[in-house]
């Protein structure tokens, strides 16, 4: 009898991707975050689908419909908070996944890396539009401020903003289209994930040493399915702890006030996972310059393969590069803190210095340091 797992057209794809996949024997827990991101996406799509059954994308009833979900729908409160805090978990896993890619030189698989950057942009766009849907104060003003940035584009800026708004301000048309895009984008993300995995399986996974591991590979199942299952358990435990004990910890109290175009909140700020980019945006006095810096803060990842000057792939055996990497991490945490602070002294100057350091580290210091390490190792 033929083995169905290896011969059936559909099962064969699953088998080659998750069961008989040759995997490096030494990949660490840092390689768990890809599967955890898949879990997060699954949680977000399922909880989002149930929320969409009860949500109404109308400016008059959106806020009330979210309240109705929490108060009247069976287990609506847990679905809503799983979705809201699931987004935070998604971004924690994303940042760790990208950080691992930078540290271990995974960006040298340029196709996989570039699809990953597209995924990052798509997830950020989805999260931004999702934040607008409850139609609280921060939803409305966040949407107004961020969409208004497009007006900085010369000549077509104002027309572009009004086209996105569907009128002369953020209103019913904006909310309806944001809901439509927020619903469809996760499925586009799921398709991009398939492409991401397709390119990854063309080359095989990287590993902590950065050395080609063809001589020492093991099947994905059962070794890494068990390892991923432990990650799933920890992630779900963390998410449920957050949802059941402190569901509003990462949210903004202003979003419990219905949107009011006549009353501006004292500090307009996005969700915590956008604060680093928001700090970079605010640190440049010129509007167009700020918008460009905001886009470049993520797009800069695309030129990382070009900036790789080291003869070694991974940072595992490069202590100077490791130091710079952890300075970059500290810098991003500083930017996240600054993004949540008011625009006043000393936060302004700290934000400007941290923004400069972010680009200087990636564009100048890290490539220069790699060249120095090559000399020290006589490579």
UniProtKB/Swiss-Prot annotation:
A ubiquinone binds at residue 201. The chain crosses the membrane at residues 33-53, 77-98, 113-133, 178-198, 226-246, 288-308, 320-340, 347-367. Keywords: Electron transport, Heme, Iron, Membrane, Metal-binding, Mitochondrion, Mitochondrion inner membrane, Respiratory chain, Transmembrane, Transmembrane helix, Transport, Ubiquinone. Binds 2 heme b groups non-covalently. Heme b b562 binds at residues 83, 182. Its cofactor is heme b. Its main location: mitochondrion. Heme b b566 binds at residues 97, 196. Belongs to the cytochrome b family. Component of the ubiquinol-cytochrome c reductase complex (complex III or cytochrome b-c1 complex) that is part of the mitochondrial respiratory chain. The b-c1 complex mediates electron transfer from ubiquinol to cytochrome c. Contributes to the generation of a proton gradient across the mitochondrial membrane that is then used for ATP synthesis. The cytochrome bc1 complex contains 11 subunits: 3 respiratory subunits (MT-CYB, CYC1 and UQCRFS1), 2 core proteins (UQCRC1 and UQCRC2) and 6 low-molecular weight proteins (UQCRH/QCR6, UQCRB/QCR7, UQCRQ/QCR8, UQCR10/QCR9, UQCR11/QCR10 and a cleavage product of UQCRFS1). This cytochrome bc1 complex then forms a dimer. This is Cytochrome b.
